[in-house]
Amino acid sequence: EFGEAGLDHDLIEQSSEEIVLMQSGCLCCSVRGDLSKTVVGLLDRRKDSEIAFERIVIETTGLADPGPLMQTLFVDHILAKTTRLDGIVTVADAANGVATLDAQFEAVSQAAMADLIVLSKTDLVTPQKVKNFEKRLRALNPSVRIVHAVRGEGLTDQIWGLSVLQPKAEKKDVLAWTLGETPQLDPLANLSGFAPAQKLSAPIPTHDTRIGSASIVLDDPIPSAAFDLCIETLISIRGPDILRIKGLVFLEGFDAPFVFHGVQHVFDLPVQLKDWPKDDRQTRIVIIARDLSRPELQRSLDLLRTHTSTPLPAS
């Protein structure tokens, strides 16, 4: 929670799970060290049979940027070995979400980096307003899954198992994770390439124009060295602006694909799947970034296209 006086833990009516409150500040900045210590402490207590659990749920303040949290899980040497990020769930208020996106760039980042967006208060607004809000969210994050919730009902089975970074991931989940739905109206069409440009009746909100996305699909296998070089070049030059990059990759010399994802300059370990989710054996990569134009994003990804047809020089 943000601030020294914690409140949310007192509002839970009943819980059999372990609740840990960190009061030293905003999770996106000053308490990242506390996060590591807290999670390690929970793991130690589980090892000593004091408590039993399978998952750890981290609820941040609405002011938080998910990026630093994800980086902590990736780079902390203990957490990287003992935990795996299952996914980012963002709750978006259907009644006030548009105003929040206009006013708070943190909200834009939360939407752009989410694996799942839960729309709340959909019963308080018209279906058309919900539809328009979903279109705006998909413009920020084309591959995100969006579900509706009224008073939190029906969510229990939908917020788990979001990550496909596991060998036994379901084929349909892998495809949804890398492709998502193609937006019908994209106010960022000049950036994302997911839809043709359309004349808008209102100006695009300033925060939204800072977020762009691009994708690439490749039929031929990529040399491992070429893939590493292209990704390392991208993150070394524009790492701080990369909100998220993820993909399904066909590497030379491997029968099954790898899935990977990263935030800014930090990447989780790639995981090889047991099989291809489709018969086409295509590499699919999606990148969501801040303050990068569509041509810049596409040029970075097109380096991979070059290396699928041109052998790397011998070292």
For each feature predicted by the language model, list its residue ranges.
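Short glycine-rich or small-residue beta-strand-to-loop segments that form or flank ligand, phosphate
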Residues: V57-T60, I117-L119, S215, I285
